[in-house]
Structure formats: C-alpha cells, structure tokens
Amino acid sequence: MQITLLKSKLHRVTTTHSELDYEGSCAIDGHFLEVAGIREYEQIQIYNVNNGNRFTTYAIRAEENTGIISVNGAAAHKAAPGDLLIIATYASMDEKEAEEFKPIMVYFDEKNQITHTRNTIPKQMQQLA
C-alpha cells in the first residue's frame, strides 16, 4: 500500500513578490530549494498564514541568496507581499519506506533568513489555563 507523507516544508517564509502577469508558478530562492530538497517544477502546496488561502502550484528557481518568494500568475490573487506562507511538498511511498523516512523542514525569520532545520515536529502539548 502507498501512503503520502510530508516530504519537505518551508515554514513561515514571507512573500516578497506577487506577479499576476508572470507565467504561473512560485519562484523560490534557489538556496531554499536546495536545503529543502525541492526540485524545480515540483508540485507544491502553499498555505497562506495571513488569510487562510491554500492552493497548489509548482516551484521554479529564483536567484540564490535573494530571499525571493514570488507567487505568480493566477495564484498571485491568493498571496500579497508580506504574507507569511508555509510551502509544502509531499511524497508517496510504501509503508516500509515510510518507517525510515524523515521530512526536511526549514524554518525562517521575518527577513527570509533560514534559522534552523528539523526532521521532526515537537509533540503538541495541552496548554494549561
């Protein structure tokens, strides 16, 4: 049986551009793609933290070390410069592969600088009143 797991995530990157008239896609700083293991033209899911929009497009490479996150084409209606995004990729694998698989999660500060990476998410704990 095949299951689908989180492959990689760019967590809380800031949208730098929103280009309605550019060919559809999301341009992502090439260094971010490398660190997260995202391939150019790979399908990505984008979750807009500011407005709740969730949409699918594909990644293209932007110039490295620029911090560019440009939402292009029709998707430009779903994200504006300054919006915080979570960009995720997923992979299908069999259950044996899934037992050993670890995603790559890349975390950012407000200036689109990488702060750290992880391959697990801390357990969510109940908040005390």
Swiss-Prot record:
This protein's name: Aspartate 1-decarboxylase
Cofactor(s) this protein requires: pyruvate
CDD domains registered for this protein in UniProt: Asp_decarbox (cd06919)
SUPFAM superfamilies for this protein: ADC-like
TM ranges: none
Any GO BP annotation: pantothenate biosynthetic process
Entry superkingdom: Bacteria
Cofactor: binding comment: Binds 1 pyruvoyl group covalently per subunit.
UniProt keyword Lyase, yes or no: yes
Enzyme nomenclature, EC number: 4.1.1.11
The protein's role, per its UniProt record: Catalyzes the pyruvoyl-dependent decarboxylation of aspartate to produce beta-alanine.
InterPro entries in alphabetical order: Asp_de-COase-like_dom_sf, Asp_decarbox
